Amino acid sequence: MAFAAGYGKTNVDLLFENMSRLPNEGEEIFTDRFSLCLGGGIPGTMVTLGRLGVECKTVTELSKDMFSEFALGEFRKAGVEPVNVYHGDKIAVNITAAAITPNDRTFVSYGNEENSVTADEVYNALKGAKAVAMHADLPEVYKKLKNDGTTVILDTGFIEGMTLEKYKDLLEIADYFLPNRKETEILSGTSDPRQAAKVFSKYVETPIVKLDKDGCLIYKNGEYILVKSIDEFVRVDSTGAGDAFFAGFLYGLMHDEPIERCVLFGNITGGKCVTAVGCTTAYFNEEELLEMAEKYKDNIIYNY
């Protein structure tokens, strides 16, 4: 059976909500709202995709600690097969504690970069997938996968100092690239989405530019297509929206849908994500997604 897959670090978020203020040094403040959830990144994308009924695999790093055990449980509940490639003896997952006040969010994070995972391990774990979410590293892995016939999709997220030259090797491998507005402007050197799409068309056949609340612009066979965002969603927390969009987009690819339908699915899953605090808290099942896609089919505007 066809499956989707991706390699990336697992993130676990501890969310302290409804805080009136941050504590001063030496103080302790209590809140009555706390949640523990999976954070963003490729494993989070696979969880949202698994909840849509797609068979998927996340290649990641887990250790023998309570946070890794929590993540493992979340993967299994979503129907995601975890493949552990961690070889160390520390806590392998990234952990973020977020203090959420009325005006802002403040973070304290832990991350362990120590690991000896090899490109061959990652390739062997991803081999055979119909579609793979690309990591910012290991271009040789994705080149081999593409040569195998796997569709490879790049969504890097914002990285300080990112340039088109730095991402050239990955873009030349990717079948699809999913930058948001900020990433698009930095990489293309223009604030005009149409011109940016033409810049990206030198690397990918069908450029896609995410325009945040304005939807997504597709440049397909010389035609611009706008897929509008979903107006009914009320934003509570935008964290994880890009990862959720990626899941909806992958759902469409896994079902051989036209690219504009893939983007519509992405707008729906990404829009749903922002209606609750946390990267993987708010989501649709497959039936709900298809109902929403039918309801908003006219959000696809051709010859834009």
Show which residues each predicted segment covers.
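Conserved N-terminal subdomain of the carbohydrate kinase-like
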Residues: 27-29, 51-131, 148, 290-304
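Glycosyltransferases and closely related glycan-assembly transferases
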Residues: 140-152
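Active-site glycine-rich loop that binds ribose-phosphate moieties when present
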Residues: 114-122, 134-137, 155, 159-166
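Conserved phosphate/ATP/ADP-binding segment of small-molecule kinases
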Residues: 148-151, 158-227
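Structural detector of well-ordered beta-strand residues that form the stable sheet scaffold
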Residues: 5, 57, 133, 153-155, ...
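Glycine-rich phosphate/adenosyl-contacting loop at the front of the ribokinase-like
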Residues: 1-61, 66-70, 77, 304
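Conserved phosphate-binding/catalytic region of the ribokinase-like
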Residues: 5, 193-304
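Short, acidic/turn-prone active-site loops that include or flank metal/cofactor-
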Residues: 11, 63-64, 111-114, 156-161, ...
